[in-house]
Amino acid sequence: MRLQKKKYYNHSYDIYDGKKIGTITFQIKHRILSLKYLEIIPEYRNQRYGEKVIDYLLSKNNVDCIVGETLKSSRGFWHKEIKRLNGVRVNTTYCDNTTSAFIIPKMKIDDLYECLSEIYHMLD
């Protein structure tokens, strides 16, 4: 599996495993991977490529946790991933079309807030 950076989009990558299987957009700051968008092409969804992508991100990148939000259409997938990787679901959202946020692996909200406040001084 490999990621290929898109030409004109910052932090966006195509996901390849011999052939293109999806698209991902993420940003890493202070060892926190902020997942913006993950799409697996429908014909590859039941072949565990979503799990493989998350495992790839955790192993290849120097990150402590993944932070993201759950779309209504992908709640089942994220529920399984949160349980599998000992994550936590948080009932706060930033976007209108999401149901909840998540942190994988589990990290105290206070610790995450401290990391984010170092990045964004306006949170204080």
Identify the role of each PLM range.
Residues 40, 46-59:
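Conserved acetyl-CoA-binding loop-helix of GNAT-fold acetyltransferases
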